[in-house]
């Protein structure tokens, strides 16, 4: 994120103070850990525009020996500069998918947050120019998103929906792939807590029906529980018109809290909602 004091020695941060400090840190790290590889993050560069990408490109055109990779991404669309004008220094490009906090708060507070369509769209934007990445993870609730990103790094031509189907087959059962995959599509459509529609009822019914074909071990696994609870919470929030109230929601949030071992967490962003 942005840093520096805003003086002429620091600003614009991404084109002056930041690369200057990173170059020094790179030298220290390589001295202490020979063979280490350096990834230079450009998170939030030119947000708003400040000439950071151009400045970094100029610096790395003169000397790129102190870093091995450029990592780029944003909260929404992938940054256009490295795609349209080339990666600074001609270095390999990594992404930094925001798979945890996007579109919901508290993060993970409603259970699983599968985003296969969003991740497919963002991957398509990178035009096969990505050499790997570092998904930003805040917890186990984005397990499906982690698997999607990992598989795209392995085979970028594979559709995310196909990855989800394999995930369901491996983690749950081949017999429930169709129903659970459809439920996950609905959960993504209802990702925003302000726009949960009647399809939430169908998603929960599909998950509940699928549970009947699973072994007890799978039904009690945390991966299944966070998906089941997300479907249940969405259904209840549709019924309550978004109000966090009622015994069903209270029990669901309490179970999520226990699964996350978040009973003693200090603040709401990392703790599911609490209903007294």
Which residues does each PLM region occupy?
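Catalytic-core regions of glycoside hydrolase
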Residues: 1-174, 261-265, 269-272
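C-terminal non-catalytic alpha-helical accessory regions
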Residues: 137-142, 157-276
